[in-house]
C-alpha cells in the first residue's frame, strides 16, 4: 500500500492505493466522523463490493445505510441529490454523518455534491472502483451534477476526507470502462509530463494487459500529477484549468449526444485529439507531435472521431462551458507534448475547421 497527500492546509487529505485495502478498517477510521455512515453506490458496483465495505464499517462499529443508484451518467442529476438527502433525513442522519462514494466518477461526483449541500456540509470519503475515478475524478474535490444544457453545471468544490483506492476492484472493470480511464492518464503526460507520455508510448501494451507493475505506475503517477496541480490551485483560478485538456470539446460531445452515449473518457479522448489539431493549426505544436498524440490515443483503443452534428450545435454547448469568460470560449491547448496553455484567443474559423475534420460520416 502506498499513500500520498493532497496538500491543502487544513483541508489536506491522503490518497491510499493498494490491493485489498477496501477491507482495511484502519485506513477508514481516521476519515470517518463520529456519526453513522451512508454508502452511496450504483447498481453495477453494489453486487461486487458493497458487502466488503459494509463489513469494514461494521468492524468499526459504524451503522451504515446503503443508497444504490442506477448505473450510468444519467444518475448525475438533481433528482438523485433529492433522493440521497431524503434517505439521509428519513434515517435521522445529522451533520456528524459520513458519506462513502463507492464507485466510479458518477458516484463520486454526486456523492461529493450531496455531502457538500446536506445540512450545509458533511464529511465524505472517495472509494473509487474505476480507473478514471482513481486517476482523476476522486482527487481534487470537484463535485456536481449535470444539467440538460451542460455537464457538471451544478456543483461545488468540496474536498473528501480521504481517497481509498483498492486496485483489486479494477479486475472486474469492463474493458471499455478501463480504456476510458486511460484518456485521463494520457492527459497528464500531455499537459505536464513529456517523460510520462513517452513511457506510455513504450508500455501501452502492458497497461492494456493490466500488468500489475504497469497499472501501479499509471495510477500513482497520475494521482501525484493531479495532487501537485490541485495543491497549487485548489479552486481552478488558473493553473488547475490545464486539467481540462480535451474537456471543452469533450463536454460538448457528451451534451450534444445526450449523456450516456459516450463514456466521459471516450469524449475526452476525442477532445484531446481535437485540441491537438487546433494547437497545430495555430502553430503551437508540430505536425509530428500531433501524429504522436493521435497514435497513442488510437493505440489505446479510444475513439478519435465525434458524431456528425451541425457545427453550430457543438459551438452552442462550448459557449456554456464553465471555462468560458465573457461569452468567449477558452481552450486548453498544447505548446508541445508536456506543456499546456490556456487561451481565449482562438479564431472561430480554426475551431470550425477542427470540428469538421474530426466528425464521422462527413461534415455538418
UniProtKB/Swiss-Prot annotation:
A Pfam family of this chain: DHQS_C
GO molecular function, one term: metal ion binding
Listed EC numbers: 4.2.3.4
Xref: Gene3D superfamilies: 3.40.50.1970, Dehydroquinate synthase-like - alpha domain
Entry coiled-coil feature ranges: none
GO BP field: amino acid biosynthetic process; aromatic amino acid family biosynthetic process; chorismate biosynthetic process
UniProt cofactor note: Binds 1 divalent metal cation per subunit. Can use either Co(2+) or Zn(2+).
Single GO cellular component term: cytoplasm
Binding annotation for Zn(2+): 184, 247, 264
InterPro entries, A to Z: Dehydroquinate_synthase, DHQ_synth_AroB, DHQ_synth_fam, DHQS/DOIS_N, DHQS_C
Recorded metabolic or biological pathway in which this protein acts: Metabolic intermediate biosynthesis; chorismate biosynthesis; chorismate from D-erythrose 4-phosphate and phosphoenolpyruvate: step 2/7
Catalysed reaction, written as an equation: 7-phospho-2-dehydro-3-deoxy-D-arabino-heptonate = 3-dehydroquinate + phosphate
Annotated residues for binding of NAD(+): 105-109, 129-130, 142, 151
Subcellular location: Cytoplasm
SUPFAM superfamilies for the chain: Dehydroquinate synthase-like (SSF56796)
Keywords: Amino-acid biosynthesis, Aromatic amino acid biosynthesis, Cobalt, Cytoplasm, Lyase, Metal-binding, NAD, Nucleotide-binding, Zinc
Primary localisation category: cytoplasm
Function, in words: Catalyzes the conversion of 3-deoxy-D-arabino-heptulosonate 7-phosphate (DAHP) to dehydroquinate (DHQ).
Similarity section: Belongs to the sugar phosphate cyclases superfamily. Dehydroquinate synthase family.
Listed name of the protein: 3-dehydroquinate synthase
Organism: Acidithiobacillus ferrooxidans (strain ATCC 23270 / DSM 14882 / CIP 104768 / NCIMB 8455)
Gene responsible for this protein: aroB
Amino acid at each position: 500500500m502506498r499513500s500520498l497527500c493532497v496538500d491543502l492546509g487544513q483541508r489536506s487529505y491522503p490518497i491510499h492505493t493498494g490491493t485489498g485495502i477496501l477491507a482495511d478498517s484502519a485506513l477508514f477510521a481516521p476519515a470517518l466522523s463520529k456519526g453513522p455512515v451512508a454508502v452511496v453506490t450504483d447498481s453495477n458496483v453494489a453486487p461486487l463490493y458493497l458487502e466488503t465495505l459494509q463489513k469494514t464499517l461494521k468492524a468499526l462499529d459504524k451503522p451504515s445505510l446503503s443508497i444504490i443508484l442506477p448505473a450510468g451518467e444519467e444518475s448525475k442529476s438533481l433528482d438523485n441529490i433529492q433522493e440521497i438527502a431524503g434517505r439521509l433525513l428519513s434515517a435521522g442522519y445529522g451533520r456528524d454523518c459520513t458519506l462513502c462514494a463507492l464507485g466510479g466518477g458518477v458516484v463520486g461526483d454526486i456523492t461529493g455534491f450531496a455531502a457538500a449541500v446536506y445540512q450545509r456540509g458533511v464529511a465524505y470519503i472517495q472509494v473509487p472502483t474505476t480507473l478514471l475515478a482513481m486517476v482523476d475524478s476522486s482527487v481534487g474535490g470537484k463535485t456536481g451534477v449535470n444539467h440538460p444544457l451542460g455537464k457538471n453545471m451544478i456543483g461545488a468544490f468540496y474536498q473528501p476526507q480521504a481517497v481509498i483506492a483498492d486496485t483489486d476492484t479494477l479486475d472486474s472493470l469492463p474493458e471499455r470502462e478501463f480504456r476510458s480511464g486511460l484518456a485521463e492518464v494520457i492527459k497528464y503526460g500531455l499537459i505536464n509530463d513529456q517523460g510520462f507520455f513517452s513511457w506510455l508510448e513504450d508500455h501501452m501494451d502492458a497497461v492494456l494487459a493490466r500488468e500489475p507493475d504497469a497499472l501501479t505506475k499509471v495510477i500513482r503517477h497520475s494521482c501525484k500529477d493531479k495532487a501537485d496541480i490541485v495543491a497549487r490551485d485548489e479552486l481552478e483560478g488558473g493553473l488547475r484549468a490545464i486539467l481540462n485538456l480535451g474537456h471543452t470539446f469533450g463536454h460538448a460531445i457528451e451534451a450534444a449526444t445526450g449523456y450516456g452515449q459516450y463514456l466521459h473518457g471516450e469524449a475526452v479522448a476525442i477532445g484531446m485529439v481535437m485540441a491537438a489539431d487546433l494547437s497545430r493549426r495555430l502553430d503551437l505544436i508540430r505536425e509530428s507531435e500531433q501524429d504522436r498524440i493521435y497514435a497513442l490515443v488510437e493505440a489505446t483503443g479510444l475513439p478519435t472521431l465525434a458524431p456528425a452534428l451541425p457545427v453550430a450545435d457543438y459551438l452552442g454547448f462550448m459557449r456554456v462551458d464553465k471555462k468560458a469568460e465573457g461569452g468567449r470560449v477558452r481552450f486548453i491547448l498544447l505548446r508541445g507534448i508536456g506543456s499546456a496553455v490556456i487561451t481565449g484567443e482562438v479564431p472561430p474559423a480554426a475551431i470550425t475547421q477542427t470540428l469538421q475534420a474530426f466528425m464521422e460520416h462527413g461534415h455538418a
